[in-house]
């Protein structure tokens, strides 16, 4: 590994794992893949300890950092969902000897990654073909990702600058589109009261859909995990297969609604840990039909690309993109 002259430490911090890498903001591909490392967060008392351990192991001293965290960033602090770490930007920067440290939401990083994605990093799920555009061209992109929950955001590119759009779109109320989905909504409403999109389109959402379909059929499915449902579907189980099909159709409807709400006419990127596991189903299900089925806007929607992100370190890539964009900021401009 050849260390960059001005290395930036980038991180993608989840509830279970902490991923680190170095970025070279002057390189055409700023994320240095051979520096990527992953650690269990339970092995460290704080984010600063984990970052210091990484830098010591790799033998490089950075002076700047961009850390994407799976939780809400509120001023100087961020709390990681499903983990007791409370991160202070200022204290962590002091501990590491950084002149600059940015804390961003992990889904803001997923959105920022769009600016650095290459054709080989994505798989087309439908719509018009997509190729990266010069950063000088204005673009509006959407990003949506089912994992433990459902992340929804976007990326606005103007005048060579990237602006991630952070939302809580996963918590928008679920709009059923068929009689079957209305029945699923009724069943889930008995458990949750209000039913959001996230109750269906995420890993636990697979379980919720399967349970509702089982109740409709008068069958007790017993306790299941998302991986059990995908495995049963792969083995040809009819109810598990229908669960995956319904998941993909609803996912498409929600992703299409996001385009209309954000004006993301230049493309939608599907990210998150669940997407690669259901990729074949996305390509051969009702995903695109429901994505495009938007009444008077159906013709326009048919031209909007939808792309599955397959980059193994999209969160780190997005943090690197944020570091690059921060360097483009004018003096005195806040980033």
Curated annotation (Swiss-Prot):
Catalytic activity: D-glucose + ATP = D-glucose 6-phosphate + ADP + H(+)
Broad class of the protein's primary localization: cytoplasm
Enzyme class: transferase
Pfam family, one: Glucokinase
Swiss-Prot/TrEMBL keywords: ATP-binding, Cytoplasm, Glycolysis, Kinase, Nucleotide-binding, Transferase
InterPro entries with a match to the protein in the record: ATPase_NBD (IPR043129), Bacterial_glucokinase (IPR050201), Glucokinase (IPR003836)
CDD domains attached to this UniProt entry: ASKHA_NBD_GLK
GO molecular function: ATP binding; D-glucose binding; glucokinase activity
An example Gene Ontology CC term for this record: cytosol
Subcellular location: Cytoplasm
Residues engaged in binding ATP: 11-16
SUPFAM superfamilies xrefs: Actin-like ATPase domain
Gene3D superfamilies: 3.30.420.40, 3.40.367.20
GO BP term, pick one: glycolytic process
EC numbers, comma separated: 2.7.1.2
Protein family membership: Belongs to the bacterial glucokinase family.
Entries under PANTHER family matching the protein: GLUCOKINASE
Name of the protein this chain belongs to: Glucokinase
Protein species of origin: Xanthomonas campestris pv. campestris (strain ATCC 33913 / DSM 3586 / NCPPB 528 / LMG 568 / P 25)
Organism classification: Bacteria, Pseudomonadati, Pseudomonadota, Gammaproteobacteria, Lysobacterales
């Amino acid at each position: 590994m050849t260390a960059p002259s001005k290395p930036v430490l980038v991180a993608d911090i989840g509830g279970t794992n902490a991923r680190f890498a170095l970025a070279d903001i002057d390189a055409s591909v700023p994320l240095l893949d051979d520096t990527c490392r992953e650690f269990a967060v339970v092995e460290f008392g704080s984010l600063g300890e984990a970052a210091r351990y990484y830098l010591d192991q790799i033998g490089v001293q950075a002076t700047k950092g961009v850390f994407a965290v799976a939780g809400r960033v509120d001023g100087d602090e961020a709390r990681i969902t499903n983990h007791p770490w409370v991160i202070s930007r200022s204290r962590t920067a002091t501990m590491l000897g950084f002149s600059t440290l940015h804390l961003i939401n992990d889904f803001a990083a997923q959105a920022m990654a769009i600016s650095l994605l290459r054709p080989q990093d994505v798989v087309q799920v439908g719509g018009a073909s997509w190729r990266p555009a010069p950063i000088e061209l204005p673009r509006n992109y959407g990003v949506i990702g089912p994992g433990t929950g459902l992340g929804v955001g976007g990326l606005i590119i103007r005048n060579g600058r990237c602006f991630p759009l952070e939302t809580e779109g996963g918590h928008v109320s679920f709009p059923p589109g068929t009689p079957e989905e209305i029945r699923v909504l009724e069943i889930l409403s008995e458990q949750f009261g209000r039913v959001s999109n996230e109750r269906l389109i995420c890993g636990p959402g697979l379980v919720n859909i399967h349970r509702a379909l089982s109740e409709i059929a008068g069958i007790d499915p017993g306790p299941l995990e998302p991986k059990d449902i995908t495995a049963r579907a792969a083995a040809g189980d009819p109810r598990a297969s229908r669960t995956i099909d319904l998941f993909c159709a609803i996912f498409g409807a929600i992703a299409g609604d996001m385009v209309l709400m954000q004006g993301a006419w230049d493309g939608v990127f599907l990210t998150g840990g669940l997407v690669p596991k259901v990729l074949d189903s996305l390509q051969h299900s009702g995903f695109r039909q429901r994505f495009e089925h938007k009444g008077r806007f159906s013709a326009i929607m048919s031209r909007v690309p939808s792309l599955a992100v397959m980059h193994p370190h999209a969160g780190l890539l997005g943090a690197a993109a944020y570091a690059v964009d921060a360097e483009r900021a004018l003096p005195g401009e806040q980033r």
